[in-house]
Amino acid sequence: MLNAAAVACIEQVRLGFVASVSPKGTFVVLDERKIAFAEIRSPGTISNIGHSPEVEVNFVDSFRRKGWRMRGVTQILRRGSADFEEIFPKWDALCADLSARIRAIVVIKVSEVKPLSTPPYDDGVTEAEMIALYKEKYAKMYP
């Protein structure tokens, strides 16, 4: 389900936008069918998932302007549960400074993965050209 390019995007970018809630910067790949994020300060996200466990997440490389759209069903693992404790070390290693505040881990069983890209690729722009363009844009924004 998750191919090498999608895995690399998640592992490099970490920031995934869950539809109708808020961006989560703690995503990890658990296996080829599961991704997950740490719930640190997301009561709205947890409430929304409680009402509807189906979610979509977008991961986009800001410079390449490419990414992945994933759809799946969530499972909330609460701190103290055996399932939480089993996978928690991934976040303790990734963001040790925040790990004490992680209240839950939200696992998404991925059922669909689609690539995303910006329209200039349709016109023949290369990744190298997109990266150069956005490096220049960001350099102007943040000199």
Describe the residue ranges of each PLM region:
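Short, structured beta-strand-loop surface elements
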Residues: 41-90
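Sterically constrained small-residue positions within well-ordered secondary structures
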Residues: 9, 28, 48, 61-63, ...
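Short, structured patches in soluble enzyme cores that scaffold and shape functional sites
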Residues: 20, 61, 109-112
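A generic local structural motif
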Residues: 2-4, 44, 93-94
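N-terminal structural module
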Residues: 1-37
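C-terminal edge-of-domain segments
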Residues: 75-143
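Short hydrophobic-aromatic micro-motifs
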Residues: 35-38, 106-108
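Generic beta-strand structural signal
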Residues: 14-16, 53-55, 66-70, 102-106, ...
